[in-house]
């Protein structure tokens, strides 16, 4: 089938990061994908080699719709393209890929149909596809063979090859955060133990004396960023794409959620914590809630990370729970097959 995937780059490259992984995964499974994006500049470092089966075009390109049209995160395809969808026979399946959330509405809303009553899309149906962490949702992006590659991977060798080898006794921590993150408080907490802090993207940390070593990394390709997460003992991640990839790493992680002006991000953060920490030992769960809340500006005062061993066990158990569910692209292909 031919897929059209529409993406608008709002800020921070998170939207295009998710869309590229989706397009590349579809292409790797033999699908033909046209990725429509209003600013493709980030793909130069995010995916420098491209991907089989994926063509990238500008938002104003002249091309007709294929079999399936996905608008990512309610980005609204151009009206002329929607009008062409309404005239095509057979009509393409129109899917709105929503943002990831652990909140209860996701299971209620996943798979709902929205008949379009206004031009240019009158007569079309739009279907809502919600990624999620539980059965009854659309699942998470996870390429076939990802876990086999993860289990074969030698993180210390990968760091060594890039001149990032930790010293004996150092833990390795990656930092990818928004500018409002309480980085100074984090550095103070990390400085109590020999630590190599690798900052990704635009996270800039001034050199510090003592047992904390800080190294700045350039923007990494998606495949190299995955390997960075696999190589670290603790990962600080942000947004949606790196958040999901940290869970596949199976290492302790802390998520900085995208802040919303109305404060809705707090409920979204707590909904995820309730899922991940369900069944966790109470002291560990309380420590992680305090840490995540402090990192997201939802509480004041320091919050020390919990002991590494139980946190590591929790991260792997959570990953195993997610692996028991079908991945997003497998579910998406089934979703489309049922409706065509």
Residue ranges: model-predicted function:
Residues 278-340:
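C-terminal amphipathic helix plus adjacent low-complexity
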